[in-house]
Design a protein with these regions (language model features):
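C-terminal boundary and immediately downstream tail of ABC-type ATPase nucleotide-binding domains
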Residues: 128-145
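ABC-family ATPase nucleotide-binding domain "signature/switch" substructure
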Residues: 3, 11-20, 30-130
Length: 145
């Protein structure tokens, strides 16, 4: 029983870190709700939040996140981004993204074109260079911030 309680506490802490706790509590049976194997009874955003929670439970030293905020609305993107920020804290993380909001706070951003690194730096450094990242950022993101 003690071990089960530790696992439950760890899962709940991970869900809170991932911003999944609120929607989980609103599921028919809360944390005891059975999900379909392919997650079709959840929204895309809810599936993303659960993926972040699962990663938090696994506690890996390195994360690889591939398009973590794709296919979700802007409101949910904020929840996912906040959850990812909590998950990434203190870890080496590789983020593959087209939505530049996902990488803006990264220590190092690498811009790839046809499989080659064409620019590298922080957000501010890349903006100052006024290269490809700058054009992508001002064209795709600046109007939304």
């Amino acid at each position: 029983v003690g071990s089960e309680m530790c696992i439950r506490d760890r899962c709940m802490a991970a869900a809170k870190l991932a911003n999944a706790d609120t929607f989980i509590k609103h599921l028919p049976d809360g944390y005891n709700t059975m999900l379909t194997g392919d997650g079709t009874n959840l929204s895309q955003g809810q599936r993303q939040l659960l993926a972040i929670a699962r990663a938090a439970v696994a506690d890996p030293p390195v994360l690889i996140l591939d398009e973590a905020t794709s296919s979700i609305d802007t409101r949910t993107e904020k929840l996912v981004q906040d959850g990812m920020d909590g998950l990434m804290y203190g870890r080496t993380t590789f983020v593959i993204a087209h939505r530049l909001s996902t990488v803006r706070n990264s220590d190092c951003i690498m811009v790839l074109e046809q499989g080659r690194i064409i620019e590298r730096g922080t957000h501010d450094e890349l903006i100052a260079q006024k290269g490809r990242y700058y054009r992508l950022y001002t064209g795709n993101f600046a109007e939304n911030s």
